[in-house]
A protein has these predicted regions:
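Basic, amphipathic alpha-helical segments enriched in Lys/Arg and hydrophobic/aromatic residues
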Residues: 61-64, 330-409
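Long, low-complexity, compositionally biased intrinsically disordered regions
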Residues: 1-101
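Basic, short loop/linker segments at the boundary and entry of helix-turn-helix/winged-helix-like folds
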Residues: 86-139, 158
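Arg/Lys-rich, glycine/proline-spaced intrinsically disordered segments
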Residues: 83-86, 119-122, 304-316, 392-403
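Helix-centered, glycine/charged polyanion-binding patches within enzymatic domains
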Residues: 279-280, 284-348
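Short, charged amphipathic recognition helices of the HTH superfamily
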Residues: 140-153, 343
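Polybasic low-complexity intrinsically disordered regions
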Residues: 118, 122, 131-132, 139, ...
Length: 409
């Protein structure tokens, strides 16, 4: 079904003047002789885009339709409208990723203030070095023993003072206290992009803890099922950076995780203007949480939902949004489509860092998955260094009790 802007765009393409320029198109207004400029990247200078923040206005639709019906020599030729890729920035980010990854990870971990060592004896490996080796190992997707060579290289580069034994990673990931540390590091790693991200999306996805081959099933007739952990994330829709994350068992519910994710993101200093999520997150509590954070929820309602079934003051905002959803479905859809970016984020993680966890128990698997999410954020930062020209500066790690408990255990 075409929305109103698309319908008007087709009318403009058929009845008004559209001129091809070197760097875009001049599109005549539907109601006046004024022209608006749509550049080759798909941005328009009309009030609908500049004031209302519309992502695809009627002038952009007019250009797309114009290119589709343009007749140069009496025949109809379809011309594909494409958007340029910043290949130079992309190539720089990809070719320098490994080197930049180590440097950014080291800078992030420098924000952890460790307590002074007490007593005599051989000094233990610092928490910074343990986390560095753990994230580096997960990023490489190597086994613990094979990753020992990576630790040796990091010592030669002076990124760590001591190359630890291969099982130091397993020891750290098996600690329950490591979970809170990694969750906070994920939030800190996203904060350099808080001036960029104001629109967010939330969802969950499963990561396998086991691997079964088709050969085993075909030969022995054994029916085996994969076991999963579920990652719940809230990410920015522009850069795909993860602002907050929680890990649950595979059958963990989605809806209860939205409130802590939004609260953590808001406390990290992000300006939550809007948040998109699917129907699984539609609840009074979630709507109120997003509103209290200053955001606007774009969460569709299930079929058969009756606004009269939600009474009381707590459901007032939920009912108001229900009426908005029913009366403005075209406008709602224009914002809701940004939710697909969270699926893109999961694809980025699984395609680059894998969708299978190597650890054997739930605590270690949970922390290994958090290391994947942290590694993803660092990769995003590397990309934005070249795309947006940012210079990441990390806020200090404030949770001293977490650091203390890890040192004691």
């Amino acid at each position: 079904m075409e929305n109103l802007r698309e319908q008007k765009g087709k009318i403009i393409a058929q009845t008004r003047a559209i001129k091809k320029l070197d760097d875009g198109f001049a599109v005549q207004s539907q109601n006046s002789k004024r022209f608006y400029f749509v550049d080759n990247n798909g941005a328009c200078n009309c009030p609908d885009c500049q004031i209302n923040g519309t992502t695809t206005c009627k002038h952009m639709f007019a250009v797309k339709y114009f290119l589709g019906i343009q007749k140069a020599d009496g025949t109809t030729e379809k011309i594909r409208l494409t958007y340029g890729q910043a290949w130079h920035a992309y190539n720089q980010a990809q070719t320098s990723e490994v080197k930049q990854f180590e440097a950014l990870l080291s800078d992030l971990l420098e924000t952890i203030e460790e307590p002074e060592r007490q007593g005599a004896g051989r000094p233990s490996l610092s928490l910074r070095e343990q986390v560095f080796c753990s994230v580096k190992k997960v990023y490489s997707q190597m086994s613990s023993r094979r990753a020992k060579g990576l630790f040796d290289e990091a010592k030669e580069k002076a990124l760590i003072k001591k190359s630890p034994y291969f099982n130091c990673v397993s020891a750290l990931l098996n600690k329950e206290e490591t979970t809170e540390l990694l969750e906070r590091l994920i939030s800190l790693s996203a904060m350099p992009l808080k001036s960029v991200e104001t629109q967010f999306a939330v969802d969950s996805s499963g990561f396998r803890t086991t691997r079964f081959s088709e050969y085993c099933r075909d030969k022995h007739g054994a029916e085996k099922k994969h076991e999963y952990l579920k990652a719940h994330i809230l990410c920015g829709t522009k850069t795909n950076v993860i602002c907050s994350a929680k890990i649950t068992e595979g059958d963990g519910a989605d809806s209860p995780q939205l409130s802590p994710l939004v609260q953590n993101t808001n406390e990290s200093g992000f300006n939550v203007v809007e948040l998109s999520a699917d129907k699984a997150y539609n609840s009074i509590n979630n709507f109120n949480t997003i509103r209290e954070a200053g955001g606007f929820p774009y969460i569709p309602y299930r079929k058969g939902t009756a606004q009269t079934c939600r009474s009381g003051n707590r459901g007032k905002f939920w009912r108001r949004m229900y009426h908005y959803f029913q009366a403005n479905q075209e406008e709602f859809s224009e914002h809701y489509h940004k939710r697909s970016n969270v699926e893109t984020t999961f694809f980025m993680i699984k395609s680059k860092l894998g969708d299978c966890l190597k650890s054997k128990n739930f605590t270690a698997q949970k922390n290994e998955l958090l290391c994947k999410l942290l590694a993803h954020n660092i990769i995003v930062l590397i990309s934005e260094i070249y795309e947006l020209g940012i210079a990441p500066q990390f806020a200090p790690f404030q949770e001293k009790e977490v650091v203390k408990s890890l040192h004691e255990n």
